[in-house]
Amino acid sequence: MGEAIVITSGKGGVGKTTTSANLGTALAILGKRVCLVDTDIGLRNLDVVMGLENRIIYDLVDVVEGRCKMHQALVKDKRFDDLLYLMPAAQTSDKTAVAPEQIKNMVQELKQEFDYVIIDCPAGIEQGYKNAVSGADKAIVVTTPEISAVRDADRIIGLLEQEENIEPPRLVVNRIRNHLMKNGDTMDIDEIVQHLSIDLLGIVADDDEVIKASNHGEPIAMDPKNRASIAYRNIARRILGESVPLQVLEEQNKGMMAKIKSFFGVRS
């Protein structure tokens, strides 16, 4: 049986959906069967980031309400043979259209067919959040170095730690801009990890190419040379249990990099 990982953040705009798309893509590149599940009912975006929006016939709500079979709603990403699929959210319903138990049952069924079920969680802590975490085994919290984003991440971590069936969450710090961090204009990695007190899974540099790729429906993880792609692929390898040093970012402050490496036990 596979495992389900919910990707959450507490607030919108930190790159949660982009992270979901790229981690799913990276895991598929590594040969794992992956199903991406968009639980942001009424505000779906994962299909656009994946370039699959024109191929949706049925959606998550159709499945739980019995209007179609599970396999009829799954959208196959033909770029990855039989490895990557999307379960789209409904665009015309609201988040109360499904209950947590229904999502949990659906995820359990998906875990029978896939190595990884990546659940893209809506922003906030209301019904959409409850739906998304209901079937998860693990959680990844995405934040950016801004104080407001870290504060919201802290709140979500507190909620996740109350979930009996979810392992302790791990952290991805997204959209790192070295010059701002070096000048003290944003929180540095050490401050973020110490404040949130969870394991650091990976860091992703801010990169305009990520936005361009998402707008074209081609997750940046498909580009083997891009630095953000390398970061996402390394995060995927860590999810698989590999010990992978953090990528050294261009113009990275040496002192900060030493602190980051210490979290992974990597010697400079």
Swiss-Prot record:
One of its GO terms (molecular function) is ATP hydrolysis activity. Interacts with MinC and FtsZ. Interacts with MinJ. GO terms for biological process: division septum assembly. The keyword Zinc-finger does not apply. The keyword ATP-binding applies. CDD domains: MinD. This is Septum site-determining protein MinD. Belongs to the ParA family. MinD subfamily. NCBIfam families: minD_bact. ATPase required for the correct placement of the division site. Cell division inhibitors MinC and MinD act in concert to form an inhibitor capable of blocking formation of the polar Z ring septums. Rapidly oscillates between the poles of the cell to destabilize FtsZ filaments that have formed before they mature into polar Z rings. It holds the Pfam family CbiA. InterPro entries: CobQ/CobB/MinD/ParA_Nub-bd_dom (IPR002586), MinD (IPR010223), MinD_FleN (IPR025501), P-loop_NTPase (IPR027417), ParA/MinD_ATPase (IPR050625). Its main location: membrane.
